[in-house]
Regions:
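Bacterial N-terminal signal peptides that target proteins for export
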Residues: 2-16
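Hydrophobic helical h-region of N-terminal Sec-dependent signal peptides
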Residues: 18-22
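C-terminal motif of bacterial Sec signal peptides marking the signal peptidase cleavage site
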Residues: 24-28
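Buried hydrophobic residues that stabilize the cores of well-folded domains
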Residues: 32-301
Length: 301
């Protein structure tokens, strides 16, 4: 007889988001039937997202057994992100195990407070438009990290994240990401973590762009430190607006002989909403082409 057992483990949230033109939206709070309401400051000035749920699911292969990872972002009736739940499911023997963590989002006057199950509290200070200018994140042990954010503002007064800078307890700058929007079809991304530097270009095809009406960030952005620490804020549009188009290719500057390129292929439903993204990392090693693939399925409603 097959047994199902659920195991809940408290884990520190670390994200999965973003070609910086691609973010989804922070939204205003009001009553709904799911208990997702939080106080709403200045609802007319804050960005919103037009969905109640954005969920990502993928199967991650491992040497032991495949793991199904699910990331669920819930929005209230006014379109503001209220919670994130991350879950990993796997079968060992005849037993089903689930590792789950939940992160909540609370809105106050010019603030968004994000708290995970490990009691890490990230407090974002918001400007009058609802976008974060600073963040202070403190874990249960009392360790503190601070972040500053700057944006490109377009002619429609929309904000797109241009820079995130992280400082540690001692005030030392530890990491940053800078996005250059000079060419919206070829975003230049500069990343530095401690002494490591990495530059890349995120592109979308000229004349064959895919409209990002799904308002989702590109997969690589929320994998990229320090933005990986802010995936909930990214999906809540606390860190900026979505792009008009989906990124389809990421090319590192340092690919050299490896010719490394990541290609993103999207499947859309009849509304034009993304239902899946297939990512292929292709590079040359010892004269042979090697591929790493991942497929993420989306439920957006």
């Amino acid at each position: 007889m097959k047994l199902n057992r659920r195991v809940t483990i408290i884990t520190r949230f670390s994200g999965i988001m973003f070609s910086l033109l691609l973010l989804g939206g922070l939204a205003a709070c009001s009553d709904d039937n799911n208990g997702n309401d939080t106080p709403e400051p200045e609802p007319s000035t804050y960005p919103t997202t037009p969905f109640s749920k954005i969920e990502l699911k993928e199967v991650i292969e491992s040497d032991a057994q495949p793991v199904t990872a699910t990331h669920t972002y819930l929005y209230n009736s006014a379109g503001r992100l209220t919670s994130y739940t991350g879950k990993q499911s796997f079968t060992a023997g005849d037993e089903l195990f689930e590792i789950e963590n939940t992160t909540t989002v609370e809105y106050k006057d010019h603030q968004a407070v994000i708290t995970d199950e490990a009691s890490t509290v990230s407090t974002y200070t918001l400007n009058d438009k609802g976008y974060a200018t600073t963040c202070t994140s403190q874990d249960m042990a009392g360790n503190t990290r601070t972040y500053t954010f700057s944006y490109l503002i377009n002619t429609e007064d929309k904000y797109y994240l241009e820079n995130i800078t992280e400082k540690l307890d001692d005030g030392k700058e530890y990491s940053f990401i800078t996005i250059d929007y000079s060419n919206f079809r070829a975003l230049r991304i500069q990343q530095k973590v401690d002494t490591f530097e990495h530059n890349s270009t995120a592109t979308t095809p000229s004349g064959n762009e895919i409209a990002n009406i799904s308002e989702i960030p590109s997969l690589f952005i929320t994998d990229m430190y320090p933005l990986s620490m802010h995936a909930v804020a990214i999906y809540g549009k606390i860190l900026g607006e979505p792009a008009n188009y989906l990124i389809t290719q990421l090319i590192p500057d340092s690919n050299g002989e490896s010719e490394e390129t990541t290609t993103y292929t999207y499947t859309l439903d009849n509304r034009g909403i993304v239902t899946s993204c297939h990512a292929v990392v292709r590079h040359i090693r010892n004269g042979y082409e090697q591929d790493y693939t991942r497929t993420v399925n989306y439920t957006i409603e």
